[in-house]
Amino acid sequence: MGLRLATFNIENLMSRFDFAGFRNALRQDRALSIYQIDDQRQYEALEAARAVATTDDTRQLSALAMAAVRADVICLQEVDNLEALDAFERHYLYRMIGRGYRQRHVSRGNDGRGIDIAVLARDETGEGQRIEIRDIQTHAFRTVSDFGLQSSELAEMGVDGGQKLFRRDCVVVDMAVGGRPFTLVALHLKSMGPSRDPDIPGREWTMPMRRAELAATRQILTDKFDGGPERMRWAICGDLNDYRERIVIHGEFEEEFRFEHVREADSSLDVLLEDGFAFDPTQKLDPMQRWTLFHSRGPGRRHLCQLDYILLSPKLAKANPDAVPQIERRGQPWRTIVPPGQEVERFPRTGWDRPKASDHCPIALELNI
């Protein structure tokens, strides 16, 4: 009995205009930075026009990327609200692609920008098995002390026991696929920056927060399944904003690039993976093929890494020994530098930097439930 599961950071699926760039140059779009803008009213009119002009191409590409992975159930990150998701599903996924998702849920989480986690499901799998969402639980309201995860590292970040733990949410979805129970955990963890200490990189500075989020996720699953989560069918999906390895890119524009595979000494993902609590099926891919994001801060600061994951319970991993993830890269912008042999034919109208489907690649996995 097959279920095709996917996760995708859709990158700012917004229904609101963001006018913060008028007072904060770091938030201003680069196109507007070229022009002399006299007042806030003019800025807001120009920003609204810019956003509307670019949205259609961007969301066509997002829909193409989602359609390409053919998921029965998909977790999305960076969704503004249910209204934005409904409009995208109706006008892009359904009308443009021809097959949509009738079951849709958006969590109202803790993100300061209001970007939330969404879960979409079809009524049936591709094999015709009914998908029934039976319960959805949010953990956005739970605090650090609820999980007993207070620490000196979090205190140094300014996080005390009374603060909400999840930067967005931990959404637990209980469903039945062809009558068989399956639990999906949807996450979007704390980002890797910025750092408040100029001597500590953003990833290192923020890692205690992601460790705590994953430790809490582990507690939630352990409590839910009475101390025996290894015996149950569950998967963790989402943008976990950390990596255990990366591909460092050496070279300059229009030169021959060199790619160096680097293992990281420490990762928040170790909380789930180090002792076999969960399994990462992307490990079946070649190390040079696991990446889902191209990171660039200019020459000498470029790498490819995996931030997006579908992690399986021991029971589900054992039942799917040959399941290999599909990473869809045709919506990546042309500026993404890829290792030899990984070139793909981009979707039509993909730009050098934009429009693009997202800065992330969707990842999908066919599972035997």
Where are these regions (language model features)?
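Catalytic metal-binding/acid-base residues of hydrolase active sites
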Residues: 11, 79-80, 188-190, 240-243
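N-terminal, active-site-proximal structural segment of metallo-dependent hydrolase catalytic domains
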Residues: 1-96, 103-116, 161, 351, ...
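Structured beta-strand-rich core segments of catalytic domains in phosphoester-bond hydrolases
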Residues: 73, 79-189
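Active-site-proximal beta-strand elements of phosphoester/diester hydrolases
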Residues: 2-12, 181-198
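Extracytoplasmic/secreted cell-surface and envelope-processing proteins
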Residues: 84, 113, 193-195, 243-247
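Short secondary-structure boundary/capping segments
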Residues: 20-24, 89-93, 200, 249-259
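Metal-dependent phosphoester-hydrolase catalytic domains
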Residues: 82, 165, 219-235, 240-369
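Stable alpha-helical elements in mature extracytoplasmic
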Residues: 58, 62, 81-84, 116, ...
